């Protein structure tokens, strides 16, 4: 999770987030190189007394500044498209979790099991236990198994919401009347926090998301207790 004075992203806890971090570094390096080149050219123009006011045609220069941007765009577009297809690809998920956004809480339903659904509200400050995080703790955490492909079905009962867990690289809009889907898979156990990322009313900032990812053995034990 994020911590005070943090610079950069949270630690990646899913293959998708790892790919997004690599893509961010890749794109940032390209931006850095372009910025350095532009600053170098500007410094040369300001420091030299020579000017080319009589230049009427420069075919080589025009060719370079046409081809080079095209190559740069291709270098950005190809890995971006690869990640885009990875995020949309859902092959034989192990289970499905349906999420509905409300003003101002989330409700969850494990569609593979009968009568396993609950609402998840933020725990108010007076009710926090020692060690709980203010404005991030909920009364009912989502328990899921690690290292398994999970299909998320996300929608809303009222207004626009957005179900977001940064460490897992997930941000999917919850739209009334529309069912969006996303893939969730973690590489390690842990507790991951998120929040609604679409302004949805006066209590928009009080819609935390808490996922508790556990090994399959412990998930099955929790499942038996909940059913």
Curated annotation (Swiss-Prot):
CC cofactor note: Binds a dinuclear copper A center per subunit.
InterPro entries: CcO_II (IPR045187), CcO_II-like_C (IPR002429), CcO_II_C (IPR034210), Copper_CuA (IPR001505), Cupredoxin (IPR008972), Cyt_c_oxidase_su2 (IPR014222), Cyt_c_oxidase_su2_TM_dom (IPR011759), Cyt_c_oxidase_su2_TM_sf (IPR036257)
Binding, Cu cation A1: 161, 196, 200, 207
Keyword Isomerase: no
Mitochondrial matrix compartment spans: 46-59
Lineage top rank: taxon: Eukaryota
Enzyme class: translocase
Binding sites annotated in the UniProt record for Cu cation A2: 196, 198, 200, 204
This enzyme's EC code(s): 7.1.1.9
Nucleotide-binding in keyword set: no
Modified residues (Phosphotyrosine): 218
Keywords: Copper, Electron transport, Magnesium, Membrane, Metal-binding, Mitochondrion, Mitochondrion inner membrane, Phosphoprotein, Respiratory chain, Translocase, Transmembrane, Transmembrane helix, Transport
PROSITE patterns found in the cross-reference section: COX2 (PS00078), COX2_CUA (PS50857), COX2_TM (PS50999)
UniProt main location, coarse: mitochondrion
GO biological process terms, semicolon-separated: ATP synthesis coupled electron transport
Membrane topology: Multi-pass membrane protein
Mitochondrial intermembrane compartment spans: 1-14, 88-227
Needed co-factor(s): Cu cation
Family annotation (Gene3D superfamilies): 1.10.287.90, Cupredoxins - blue copper proteins
Ranges annotated as spanning the membrane: 15-45, 60-87
Residue sites binding Mg(2+) per the record: 198
Catalytic reaction equation(s): 4 Fe(II)-[cytochrome c] + O2 + 8 H(+)(in) = 4 Fe(III)-[cytochrome c] + 2 H2O + 4 H(+)(out)
Role played: Component of the cytochrome c oxidase, the last enzyme in the mitochondrial electron transport chain which drives oxidative phosphorylation. The respiratory chain contains 3 multisubunit complexes succinate dehydrogenase (complex II, CII), ubiquinol-cytochrome c oxidoreductase (cytochrome b-c1 complex, complex III, CIII) and cytochrome c oxidase (complex IV, CIV), that cooperate to transfer electrons derived from NADH and succinate to molecular oxygen, creating an electrochemical gradient over the inner membrane that drives transmembrane transport and the ATP synthase.
Family: Belongs to the cytochrome c oxidase subunit 2 family.
Subunit structure: Component of the cytochrome c oxidase (complex IV, CIV), a multisubunit enzyme composed of 14 subunits. The complex is composed of a catalytic core of 3 subunits MT-CO1, MT-CO2 and MT-CO3, encoded in the mitochondrial DNA, and 11 supernumerary subunits COX4I, COX5A, COX5B, COX6A, COX6B, COX6C, COX7A, COX7B, COX7C, COX8 and NDUFA4, which are encoded in the nuclear genome.
Annotated protein name in UniProt: Cytochrome c oxidase subunit 2
Organism, as annotated: Nycticebus coucang (Slow loris)
